[in-house]
Every structure is written in structure tokens, then in C-alpha cells.
Amino acid sequence: MAAHYDVLIVGGGIAGLSLASALAGSCSVALVEAEQELAYHTSSRSARQLIPSYGPEVVQELTVRTLELMAARDGQLPEPVLTPRSFMLIGSEESVRAEASGHMSPITHDRALELCPALVPGAFSAAGLDTGSFGCNAPLLLADHRLRAEAAGADIITGARVHSAQRLGSGWEIGAGQEAFEAGVMVNAAGAWADEIAVISGVEKLGLQPYRRTAAIVDVERPLPEQSPMVAAADNSFYFRREGEYVLISPVETVPSGPEDARPRPGDIERLIVRLNQVTTLGIRDVRSAWTGLRTEAADGVPVAGFDAEAPGFYWLAGQGGYGFQTSSAMAELAAGQILAGQGAGLGAGSGAGHSAGAAHHPASRTAEALAATRWSIRR
């Protein structure tokens, strides 16, 4: 016999977990995750930096709102999720100007070297600084969302890969692992697998494209000072930041991939180490660990949050690209407001409870329109 819920969320990464914690208590919620552990793929492989100056305008707006929501929650946690950590962009005058936004201020060459003495002076000619950027304790944030969701009555089921889904009356019938579910709303928060979930559900896919993003923790001869900013090349060729006594580095590659358990490819990190040892005095010695995540994007590079145009009760929460953590709380707030308002499928008694969850971002807002799954620019 199928278990019934108002909302069933497919995907246990930061998107699905943050939505589960936003919805639970206002309606009945289940979250199913294909892997045996939550946040296994992209969310556990994040750079853990929230950058208001990063991404398109709507992403920057979502980031500011996410930081507000996380800061409010920090006061209720035993340790903070957010830690101030500036973000510095370096490169040519032209490239820095092209990548900078209103959240970033230009700084002098000398000031950039003061902030990050490891930089070789001749390696860049211009720099910009975002002092509103924060480091993120991703494991703590994920755990808090799970605890809040479960405390409010949500059921979280791991090792339950969705293998079937179809419309049933006014809702959905979903098979995941050995379990059967019925739900008024099905939320597709499956990351790199979001298009596959759509196809399984008989819904037209959006043409979402996963891209590889590799990172590594390296041992260095000269560790970065404690207050060092995260440093990124304006030409998107690398970034690095302090990770305790070590340094986190990334080649910032944009290589298309299928949905998979991605792994570093031979040469990616080695080539980056050669480059960083030319533009910094870090003296990278050994690779302690390396990993590859998948960041999945829509054709226009903007995340997707909204009901499908043709499939009632099918809600897209996908395509976050490299902005997953920094937009997560704001996108969950928006999605909860739309779902609880009963768009696409009624939730009975729960439908009136969504006004507080989504008050800051009304479903008819400009932000909602920019993220809508019905927008013309989304499909490839």
C-alpha cells in the first residue's frame, strides 16, 4: 500500500533538504534519495563559499536573501554556519571589470597583495574585493535542515532511487526503491539527474546540462594567513582559499558530463598545481584529497524553481549550477510559498499555511518569474 504525502521531494542534496525543512510542519512531506547517504554527490563537494557578487543578477538577489535567512538561523545553533571570508577577483583590468558586480569594489594592486601576500605581483594587474562574502559550514547546514525537517514530521528515506512516476487523479504515484508513494506535488530536486526524473515521470525534460568541477586539498610550504580571502582568477582558470593549514584549489573547469558519480581526471589537478606555483608563492607540495562534483545548469544559466508548464503538480527545483548553497534558503522559501499556495495541485488544509514560508518572495514576484520552469530561455 502506498504511503500518502502532500509533497514528495526527489533528491537529498541542499536543494531538497532546505525545501523539506521549509515545508515540514505546514504539510506532510517525504524526501527520497537514491544514495545511501544524503548530499552524496554535488552538495558534499561544494567550495563552501557564499559570494553575493557571483552569478547573474537574480542569483545575487537570492544569495543576499539566503545570507539573511542563514544569519537569522545562526543565532539558534551551537556554532555558526557562516564565517566572514572575503572574495577577491584578480586578473587584467578588462577581465576584472567584466566579472565584477555591484557587490564588489575595485582595490589597488598593493591592497590585493596585502590581503593575499602569496600572490606573485606580476601575476595580475587589477583586483576587486567582495567583503560581504562568507564561508559556509556545509555539513552543519545540511544536518540542521535534516533535523528541522524530521522534527517537524518529514520522512527522509535514503537508498530509494525513483524508478517510476505517473499522474494519479489529482496527484502523483511514485515508486522509489522498494517503496510506493502518493503525493499531491512531486518536487524534482534531483540535481544532475533532474532531467532523468522528468523522463521517468512522463514530463518533458528541460535540457539541463551537468558540468564537471574538480577541487583538491593541498599541502603547501607557506600556508595562507587566517584572514586570507578566497582568490579567483577573473578568466575562470582557478580559485584557491585557505582550508586550515592547507589550501583548497580548483581549476574551475567547465566540461560537460552526464549524470554520474564524478571523479577527478588525470592531469587536471597536476596542471593547476603547476599554474598556481607560477602565480603564487604557496609552494604546493602534496595533494591530500581531490574530488569532482557536478553543477547542473539550464540553457540560460539561471536556476529553475516552479511548476511545470504541462504537468500539474510537478515542481522543478533544479539547475542551480555553482550557486546551490548560496541560493538554497531563498529558493526553498520561494518554492515553499508556491507549493503551499496550491499552485499546480491543491494541498487541502495545508494550502493556507504557506504565506509565512513564502512571504518575502510572493509567487507572482519578479524573482519567481525569472526562475520559472515555463520561461522561454530555459530549454536547449
Protein language model features and the residues they cover:
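C-terminal catalytic lobe of FAD-dependent flavoproteins
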Residues: 278-380
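Helical element adjacent to the flavin cofactor pocket in flavoenzyme catalytic cores
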Residues: 132-180
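Helix-loop-beta segment of a Rossmann-like dinucleotide-binding subdomain
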Residues: 78-89, 106-152, 252-259, 312, ...
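Active-site substrate-recognition segment that forms the wall
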Residues: 21-22, 48-50, 78-83, 190-313
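Dinucleotide-binding Rossmann-like beta1-alpha1 core, especially the glycine-rich loop
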Residues: 47-118, 122-126, 237-239
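N-terminal Rossmann-like FAD-binding beta1-loop-alpha1 element of flavoenzymes
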Residues: 5-30
